[in-house]
Amino acid sequence: KIQEGKGYLVPELRGIFDSWYDQKLKTEIYPQYQDVLTIKAEEIKAIPKGTAYERLQKMVGISQIKAVIEKALNYNKLQKIYREKGIKTGRPVMHMVFTGNPGTAKTTVARLLAQIMQDNGLLSRGHLVEVGRSDLVGKYVGWTAKCVKEKFKEAKGGVLFIDEAYSLLDNRAGSYGDEAINTIVQEMENHREELVVIFAGYPEKMEEFIQKNPGLRSRIAFHVSFPDYNELELCQIAQLMGKEKGIEFTQ
């Protein structure tokens, strides 16, 4: 319930709306949702499986992506509970944007994310297909859409990682880059339950890229920031790397 005269952050308002709308679905729009009222929070907390998840948890920093994965796994378990109660639901959009400077583990995390989703039933294959502009934009008219569709086909059941996605922008209407972006948006919708698309790059450039494409923006579920490591985190990373190789560092 929104209190008069109180200020709210955008995430808080979204949470209030989600809670209200969920209650509306259960009690007024779809009476069959009444049974879901008995589901307790602890019942939908997933127990993640797989070595990829364990590796991710050991990584230094990246708390935001860890929270995103927890949310995705919990929602997947909730979907299973819904199905057991006879409630038909489609898988929510899982496409993401990773922003950060080089060396902040974006590609490494994307690869682990693909495997985690496969280990826990969200994806069928769990592989990573990494592409850039040269993989998506054709040399001649009519080639670009075909290139994009081939990469989506290759990534089916896994994660399509589009690095430096803003390089697709040509700043002129009707360009091959525009054709690539429009086809990507179409394929994201057509295969929303079959793969996850991750757009990655520098924060400022990625923000500009997303803002210029409303259709793309509406299909992104999570925006994950990868901040630069501080001195303490770099020391922790060095210690972990040394431990894996049997090397012990002294003070």
PLM segments and residue spans:
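Canonical AAA+ ATPase core
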Residues: 166-172, 181-227, 232-235, 243-245
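Walker A/P-loop
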Residues: 87-126, 150-154, 220
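Conserved C-terminal "switch" segment of AAA+ ATPases
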Residues: 1-10, 27-29, 120-125, 208-211, ...
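Hydrophobic positions in the central parallel beta-sheet of the AAA+
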Residues: 96, 129-131, 160-161, 197
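Pre-Walker A (pre-P-loop) alpha-helix and adjacent loop at the N terminus of AAA/AAA+ ATPase modules
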Residues: 51-94
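Short glycine-rich substrate-engagement loop in P-loop NTPases that contacts/grips substrate
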Residues: 125-155, 178
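Conserved P-loop NTPase "ATPase switch" module shared by AAA+ and STAND
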Residues: 132, 155-174
